[in-house]
């Protein structure tokens, strides 16, 4: 199976999903300034890092961004190199399946063979060179037939917050090429016991949420598994071919009618039921030091390199003002600009302060910070979310 290819040989359109609200990164992440437009681990924002990561694979004119009406102007400011009409704002949040379908149907009309890459806006990748190698191989594989390519990250722990991919047979390739595996099935966020079994088996990888498929393959997969959504997308795509004004009118009217469903549940899981020999779903190894930065604990691990370290962002540990003093304390994450923070005899805490809010939790419970946002919403405190 040929999977070699290059940027010049293959038409490639990266689609960056940037519509999430990032509630688990409250209080820094808010509706109008969600985590994908924040510089959480450096000077560049998450979405800027994503575009830079894709630069060796596609020109900026080929990139699309799907976001919401609270973030689209800010994203346009942060990404001046991306065409403004390629930054689409969803009229309603509908999860990843409608967003992927939108890209597929819009591009199918004029570029059916173009490979679409779906990339979340809020991931971090330390090994950029390996990332480009893997994605380039995936582009070529997706372009060589009616194939869906997913990237699977080798698990380092029994994580219950990720989806898992069960790997099937290895596909024979020429010497030096990256060998894909067929996919047996997808399992979304297993319980702790099942996650332990998956990792122990050595035959499962984390689902990185990065997918590659031609525009035609993507659109046809939606037609097969989500026929109602497909009809809605046909109307949107037809309007897009008419005029910008007509597109915006129909998009606003029709898109909210789509089911709120992830692409995993909508397409990948039902397609995998066909069996690995017929589903034409392939997995390439995402061995490029990946982190989805799903919560404050994940950011601590990404920044620290090893969990026992204290990590301070916007504070400096015992070096200069503002500073963070640590006495008999390890594994803590601190973000409190302009404040002196003292940690005495505490371990594995997350301390995050903004102008109007203070969060204190444990790293273990940082996955649950989104519940704070839910409580604020029910209390009518929209000013804090």
Listing of model-derived features with the role each one plays in the protein:
Residues 2-16, 23-34, 39-136, 153, ...:
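Conserved N-terminal catalytic core of the sugar/cofactor nucleotidyltransferase
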Residues 10-12, 60-61, 83-84, 111-114, ...:
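Short coil/turn connectors at secondary-structure junctions
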Residues 1-11, 215-385:
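Left-handed beta-helix
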Residues 17, 67, 120-121, 214, ...:
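A secondary-structure boundary/capping signal
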Residues 42, 52, 56-59, 80, ...:
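Generic secondary-structure signature for well-ordered alpha-helical cores
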Residues 128-253, 280, 363:
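Conserved core of the sugar-phosphate nucleotidyltransferase
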Residues 47, 103, 122, 165, ...:
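Residue-level signal for inorganic ion chemistry
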């Amino acid at each position: 199976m040929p999977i070699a290819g290059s940027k010049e040989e293959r038409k490639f359109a990266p689609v960056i999903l940037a519509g999430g609200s990032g509630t688990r990164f409250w209080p820094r992440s808010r509706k109008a300034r969600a985590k994908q437009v924040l510089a959480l681990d450096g000077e560049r924002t998450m979405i800027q890092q994503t575009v830079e990561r894709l630069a060796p694979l596609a020109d900026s004119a080929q990139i699309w961004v799907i976001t919401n009406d609270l973030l689209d102007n800010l994203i346009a400011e942060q990404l001046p190199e991306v065409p403004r009409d390629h930054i689409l704002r969803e009229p309603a949040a509908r999860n990843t399946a409608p967003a992927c379908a939108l890209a597929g149907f819009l591009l199918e009309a004029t570029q059916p063979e173009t490979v679409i890459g779906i990339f979340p806006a809020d991931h971090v990748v330390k090994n950029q060179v390996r990332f480009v190698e893997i994605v380039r191989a995936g582009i070529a594989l997706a372009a060589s037939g009616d194939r869906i390519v997913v990237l699977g990250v080798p698990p380092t722990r029994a994580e219950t917050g990720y989806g898992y991919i069960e790997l099937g047979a290895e596909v024979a390739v020429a010497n030096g090429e990256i060998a894909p595996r067929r996919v047996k099935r997808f399992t979304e966020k297993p319980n702790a016991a099942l996650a332990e079994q998956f990792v122990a088996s050595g035959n499962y990888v984390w689902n990185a949420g990065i997918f590659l498929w031609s525009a035609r393959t993507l659109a046809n997969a939606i037609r097969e598994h989500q026929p109602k959504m497909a009809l809605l997308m046909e109307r949107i795509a037809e309007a897009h071919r008419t005029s910008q004004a007509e597109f915006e009118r129909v998009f606003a009217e029709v898109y909210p009618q789509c089911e709120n469903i992830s692409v995993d549940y909508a397409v990948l899981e039902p397609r995998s039921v066909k069996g690995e020999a017929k589903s034409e779903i392939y997995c390439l190894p995402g061995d490029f030091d990946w982190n989805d930065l799903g919560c404050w604990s994940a950011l601590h691990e990404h920044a620290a390199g090893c969990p026992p370290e204290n990590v301070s962002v916007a504070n400096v540990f015992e070096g200069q003002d503002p500073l963070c003093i640590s006495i008999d304390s390890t594994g803590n994450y601190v973000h409190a600009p302009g404040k002196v923070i003292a940690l005495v005899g505490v371990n594995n805490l997350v301390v995050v302060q903004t102008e109007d809010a203070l969060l204190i939790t444990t790293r273990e419970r940082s996955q649950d910070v989104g519940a704070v946002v839910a409580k604020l919403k029910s209390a009518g405190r929209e000013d804090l979310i």
